[in-house]
Amino acid sequence: MSSVFETLKERGYIAQLTHEEKIKELLEKEKITFYIGFDPTADSLHVGHFLQMMVMAHMQKAGHRPIALIGGGTAMVGDPTGRTDMRKMMTREEIKHNADCFKKQLSKFIEFGEGKAIMVDNADWLLDLNYIEFLRDIGVHFSVNRMLTAECFKSRLERGLSFIEFNYMLMQSYDFLKLYKEYGCIMQLGGDDQWSNILGGIDLIRRKEGKEVYGMTFTLLTTSEGKKMGKTEKGALWLDANKTSPYEFYQYWRNIHDADVIKCLKLLTFVPMEEIEEYAKLKDQEINIAKKRLAFEVTKLIHGEEEALNAQKTAEALFEKGASTDNMPTTEVASGELSNGINIIDLLLKTKLIPSKGEGRRLIEQGGISVNDVRVEGFDRLVTMDDFNNGELIIKKGKKTYHRVKLV
């Protein structure tokens, strides 16, 4: 059985390491505590966090203890990494709510509890810091000249970097020191854009404690063209079903570029490498087999097997010839009726899915009506020709009632 280090390397997670041979030895022979930071600026994790969650899962399965650090304190300041502007400040209540949402989502990948994964919030120690003591004990170890060469600051210098954001590296470094002293945490993991901040923490612990600790960054999730993955027309691809439906989530992965399928199977699923190597041999239309497997596996990880199966069935019913739409109740609509669009409530009445307009409004208010598995958000939703795939669309009422609308 290969070590977790070999697994991470073989599947393509690792971007940079501070001490490759030592880290390899540690992960193979010892059980370590490591941490990954999460920025609580939204009430859901998104695809950008997916890869980090997979790394935590691989590490915990190998016997290592994860710490999920919620940046409640640093979120009140703002990480300049990858940003060209300053962001709004958050309240403690907002941060607490978001952290609770994160823990629920992370629990699908790692196990929390006694002797297992833990979640901490750096607001618990950062908000109580004495500024003079912090400058004297921590700030003294940082060279401004060296900090200014870090990638995370370079892009902001011309546009302007506030002093409050300039402190971010010091605070993240202090987090590592705090977790080292309190939990024996000896490794920080993060996206490759966090490399400078990770090195800052390693250097601080070496200077303050005289101890060697380690850092590892992983590949950022990008397409073969170098663009960030997880962006849709509606914005980020969220892991919360209320923000991105399981069907939309499934379809995103089902429709990714051929060149990205194998990479995503390695990084975002637990499909064994031997199987992935077989998928890599597929050509042309056969690649769709690998895409379906990818879409199913990632949706199962985030939303559970039942939702993944539902999304798969809906996609097949909508887009694959000879699929089960033939057996659905069907209403035929003349294309002329759609020249200016047809109101969703009028269409529901036409299909006899509702007895009255009032019932239609009630269902829409409760989120109970979907068109092609995308929830209808307002009473004024117009159904147009653009909603039809191969001359048909599917309306879903509640969880189990499907109805086909067919163009004639």
Curated annotation (Swiss-Prot):
Membrane-spanning parts: none
InterPro entries: aa-tRNA-synth_I_CS, aa-tRNA-synth_Ic, Rossmann-like_a/b/a_fold, S4_RNA-bd_sf, SYY-like_C, Tyr-tRNA-ligase, Tyr-tRNA-ligase_bac-type, Tyr-tRNA-ligase_bac_1
ATP-binding listed as a keyword: yes
Occurrences of domain S4 RNA-binding (ranges): 342-407
CC terms in the record's Gene Ontology section: cytosol
Residue window of motif 'HIGH' region: 40-49
Annotated function: Catalyzes the attachment of tyrosine to tRNA(Tyr) in a two-step reaction: tyrosine is first activated by ATP to form Tyr-AMP and then transferred to the acceptor end of tRNA(Tyr).
Name of the protein in its database record: Tyrosine--tRNA ligase
